[in-house]
Amino acid sequence: MMDKELLEAALAARERAYAPYSKFLVGAAVRAESGKIYTGCNIENASYGLTVCAERNALFNAVGAGERKFTALCVVGDTEEPISPCGACRQVMAEFKVPCIILANLKGDVKEYTLEELLPYGFTL
């Protein structure tokens, strides 16, 4: 079931994105098992490899606050179809076993996936 509060938090986070190079603003919000929502936005850098995606930013904010278990993550961007996370973000979601991933665009299109649907053969140790 769509988590409207999580989507609204991701939309608000998107407004704080720092994307002077691509102009591609992305927001994400993750709900911890505690119920608390943590947000993140993409933050670009002139040295492109140092750019941090919104999804990882949100998860790292939560982990930095002591959270380790999550129920859902939502990411939103201005794309034709609901935005799709990059491979690095999918692997970080796998590290923290995020069970429900909600992808959305600004037109109101929303799709929900399980982690296994987005990353069926993620790397594990």
Where are these regions (language model features)?
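Short beta-strand scaffold segments in enzyme catalytic cores
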Residues: 23-32
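Short glycine/threonine-rich catalytic loop with a Thr-x-Gly-x-Asp
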Residues: 18, 47-51
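A short acidic/small-residue loop/turn micro-motif
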Residues: 45-46, 118
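Short, solvent-exposed cationic patches
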Residues: 53-74
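Polybasic, low-complexity association/targeting segments
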Residues: 1, 38-39
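C-terminal binding/interaction regions
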Residues: 2-19, 67-125
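Local cysteine-cluster metal-coordination motifs and their immediate loop/turn environment
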Residues: 41, 50-56, 60, 81-95
